[in-house]
Amino acid sequence: GQFPFPRDMYADIIRELYKREAGLVVFNVLMPEKDRFGKDNVLGNTLKQYPVVLPALGSERSKNTNHGSPAQVVGMDPAGLVVEYPGLINNVEPQESLAAGVGVVNTFPEIDGVVRRMPMVILSQEQLHPSLALETLRVAAKDPRFQVKISDMGVEAVRVPKFGKIPTDDVGRVWIDWSASPREFSYMKLPESFDGGIVVVGLSAA
């Protein structure tokens, strides 16, 4: 949506991160509406120059254009065997078509409401779409496809060829390691160099 900054500021952030030797930038900021400041083309021009992975959201409805999925499915039709959403909310143009990759950010709460697992893939509009994490691995590896093997028992394997198999349950979910402590930085206090690492950009009201 519109919160909180005009998108030329996002473009500035992307350029600054690559100036500081980011290997890949991932934006966990969905942009389903046009920028009210009219800066979508400024961000689009930056996405032409620098690889950035953007999010999408599985939903009851669809919004904006889905440009397909880099999935290679081996085996059975995934319908009824993976997490499924009728629609997909994508980013506005030109962001969606210029992104290096697009991955969904849906979680999968347990019956008690706690999020312990999240899907690596979802099915929407008859296509298998990667999670933001899986798409980040694919883009970082420069692989044209990610692969999913499906049998009548469900998901048997999810993999990006360069990184190997990702262990999932039979509907393609992975357990979340909440004990992991990724390095966090304020935009006002960035390191001199990210040494080729993957940088995930999120927003906080704090």
What are these regions (language model features)?
Residues 1-169, 193-206:
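Non-transmembrane functional regions of envelope-associated proteins
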